[in-house]
Structure formats: structure tokens, C-alpha cells
Amino acid sequence: MEAFVSTFDMKTDAKGRVSIPKAFREVLKAESFSGLYCIPSPDGQAIDAGGGRLFSMLQSKLDGLDPTSMEYDLLSTAFFGESEIVNVEKEGRVTLPTRFQEQADIEGDMIFVGKGYKFQIWSPGRYATYRQQALAQARTVLWGSEQPAGAMS
């Protein structure tokens, strides 16, 4: 199974379109998903994006719930009512919905970050802050609260 990996700085064109990184397009193609499934990230800092695996993962969260329950109603609104399937041009470009860009504080260039079954689209400033948190958390998980002697940060 292919995964979304790596980080890419992407430029927008004069029409506000951005190219999905080629490596990510290949994963989307392998998933046989038409378009790009986009949803605000749970913390509201970025845009979650992907194909069939992201869509299926969210659907599986609902599958065990009573479809008449309030929990199902709330989650289905968050997962599907707040999402959009964005058209991917044959050249691999997309125009992200304005509401998603505003929510993620994206104004122009974007950072695409692989997350395995999905990827995220960030504003460069927000991602720089988040990246530092992620790396600090990874160091804590790998080495505990203390970094081993001689380790590079």
C-alpha cells in the first residue's frame, strides 16, 4: 500500500491554483478516487486531504454508530457536511475552496505534508510552528524527556 510521505513547498499560480505534488498524485491514482477529498483538520489549523483511504477511514468511524443518534448526526456533519471533493485538473492542479483557505490561514503558497493515509495542506507560517511541536513530541516519544548524549536535534 502506498502512503503520502514527505513535505513539499508548493507555489500557487495567477489563477489561485496549486499543483498537487507528483508523489501525492501517484498515491491518489493508486487509490482510484475521483477528485481530491478535502476537509478542515480537526484542530482547524490545516486542510486534511486525500482519496479513498481518508474517505473510508472517516466512514468507518460512523459505521459502528446508530444512524439515528446525535453522535452520528454530529460526526457525519463534521466529516461530510464540512468536506468537499475538489476537481483535480489533468495537469494535477486544484483550486482549494476559499473557506478552507481562510480557515487554514492560507494566502498564496502552501506546504503539503504527508501523513500516511492522508496529507495536510498548511500555510507556511502555521506549519513552521506545528513542525517544531511535532519534532519535539517525536523526540520525547523516542528518547523520553531527555535527549541521549551526542544525539543531534
Where are these regions (language model features)?
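Short, structured motif recognition centered on aromatic/hydrophobic residues
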Residues: 16-20, 49, 92-96, 100, ...
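Helix-adjacent hinge/juxtasegments
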Residues: 48-85
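C-terminal end-helix/capping segment
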Residues: 113-140
